[in-house]
């Protein structure tokens, strides 16, 4: 018995040393909806996020949700909030073992006029790389607690994991900008895609060559229903846009739209999710879609399973998205 205990203690000690030295440690597969941990064993805190693939490394950026959740009084919807915690970054070579890189863009304390003050909203950060300027550019949704500010914020860095320097925020072409994503096309042109006009339209706006400001080229995607949580990808020269309905932190069905050009006509396509749970996007909300390297028909669909009364405890749902007869199909898998 004593021998086994000694062996166990030695093993536990080795694991601990490996973690402290930042070496590879065995991490269980990422079970959807369970707490996911980084290489140090801490819960991954990167919500409403996106991935950047750069020089063989994946960087995961997301909202830091930390602290007590409270309900903003006198709102028309369940406006649950935590202090705006800035943007975190994790890195991985295998999309499975995630190393915490630190806070890529910190929030600001005690300056209520600043976009990044902890009293505000910093959501859905995404990062792309500009080959010409050699800068990493982050766009995000910045807002007031009641969502009346509705602006797109931009930050820049020389290194993928940051730190990022905040440059300010805009209403692109005078248009409201809430839930946002960022897309870089094969021709190096980049676009922001954001919920606008009180979520009645999604808009796509071409960015300047340095990716730091919106141009006047933009399009309004209208549909019968309000949309949020945009995620864009390209397949066989067509563009696909997955969005959610607008029910705050509560899940709802996803839909997709398809277009021949990002600024072109978008056609509504229906619900990409199928099987039990499809009607709530498997209790989650879209945030990003990443092409899987070496698997031309397969994408990674990233979504958030929000815990509205304890936002810090929100979870991640990553599912395979398969293109079948020109349509995206998302099915549940356990991990
Ligand atoms: C969601 C939106 C989230 C967050 C939330 C607040 O629908 O997609 O990013 O803003 O509303 O209620």
What annotation goes with each model-predicted range?
Residues 1-22:
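Bacterial Sec-dependent N-terminal signal peptides
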Residues 19-335:
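Carbohydrate-active catalytic/glycan-binding domains of CAZyme proteins
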